[in-house]
């Protein structure tokens, strides 16, 4: 249920920085990273690209990493990822030093479970909420049930059950799930017709404006 410190990564200390050095590291299958926190000087590292991506894929960005830095163990969390806009590969990672027993603030995904009542439409307004938890006890996800929920049901962040030792940071009134009455076929047809009329009116207005400018 909770993250563990079993995500071992053997990392190397970067001896050179800059764009050129980062490109060379990525070509070698490494991910440039900076480790910071607890008042220490930022440390420039190279993470094993394949292993780090596997940790994120299987355990998520809230996974506690156990970094082996020149034989010394250091726990860390991923705080930010810089992703290539086209290739969608990790270009750089920002890591935060954490200690056993220390509490950290993180975002955790909210998963909706169950089947709402008949003739309802369910929308998830928020996909994640902020919580505070011990670094080694961050829940992988939080669940909220909509089983049998009727139209008008609204579930907020403050109504989500949290594990022991975990506290809510997000606004308790933050809307997470909204259940409304499903529109009828006639209502849907009316919405489509209204949208088409609005689009036609916008096109006509644009054509009239263009004609006026050309005169």
Swiss-Prot record:
<comment type="subunit">
    <text>Part of the 50S ribosomal subunit; part of the 5S rRNA/L5/L18/L25 subcomplex. Contacts the 5S rRNA. Binds to the 5S rRNA independently of L5 and L18.</text>
</comment>
<dbReference type="GO" id="GO:0005829">
    <property type="term" value="C:cytosol"/>
</dbReference>
<keyword id="KW-0689">Ribosomal protein</keyword>
<dbReference type="InterPro" id="IPR029751">
    <property type="entry name" value="Ribosomal_L25_dom"/>
</dbReference>
<dbReference type="InterPro" id="IPR020057">
    <property type="entry name" value="Ribosomal_bL25_b-dom"/>
</dbReference>
<dbReference type="InterPro" id="IPR011035">
    <property type="entry name" value="Ribosomal_bL25/Gln-tRNA_synth"/>
</dbReference>
<dbReference type="GO" id="GO:0008097">
    <property type="term" value="F:5S rRNA binding"/>
</dbReference>
<keyword id="KW-0687">Ribonucleoprotein</keyword>
<dbReference type="Pfam" id="PF01386">
    <property type="entry name" value="Ribosomal_L25p"/>
</dbReference>
<feature type="region of interest" description="Disordered">
    <location>
        <begin position="1"/>
        <end position="25"/>
    </location>
</feature>
<dbReference type="InterPro" id="IPR020930">
    <property type="entry name" value="Ribosomal_uL5_bac-type"/>
</dbReference>
<feature type="compositionally biased region" description="Polar residues">
    <location>
        <begin position="1"/>
        <end position="10"/>
    </location>
</feature>
<dbReference type="Pfam" id="PF14693">
    <property type="entry name" value="Ribosomal_TL5_C"/>
</dbReference>
<comment type="function">
    <text>This is one of the proteins that binds to the 5S RNA in the ribosome where it forms part of the central protuberance.</text>
</comment>
<dbReference type="InterPro" id="IPR037121">
    <property type="entry name" value="Ribosomal_bL25_C"/>
</dbReference>
<keyword id="KW-0699">rRNA-binding</keyword>
<feature type="region of interest" description="Disordered">
    <location>
        <begin position="187"/>
        <end position="215"/>
    </location>
</feature>
<protein>
    <recommendedName>
        <fullName>Large ribosomal subunit protein bL25</fullName>
    </recommendedName>
</protein>
<dbReference type="GO" id="GO:0006412">
    <property type="term" value="P:translation"/>
</dbReference>
<keyword id="KW-0694">RNA-binding</keyword>
<dbReference type="InterPro" id="IPR001021">
    <property type="entry name" value="Ribosomal_bL25_long"/>
</dbReference>
<comment type="similarity">
    <text>Belongs to the bacterial ribosomal protein bL25 family. CTC subfamily.</text>
</comment>
<dbReference type="GO" id="GO:0003735">
    <property type="term" value="F:structural constituent of ribosome"/>
</dbReference>
<dbReference type="GO" id="GO:0022625">
    <property type="term" value="C:cytosolic large ribosomal subunit"/>
</dbReference>
<dbReference type="InterPro" id="IPR020056">
    <property type="entry name" value="Rbsml_bL25/Gln-tRNA_synth_N"/>
</dbReference>
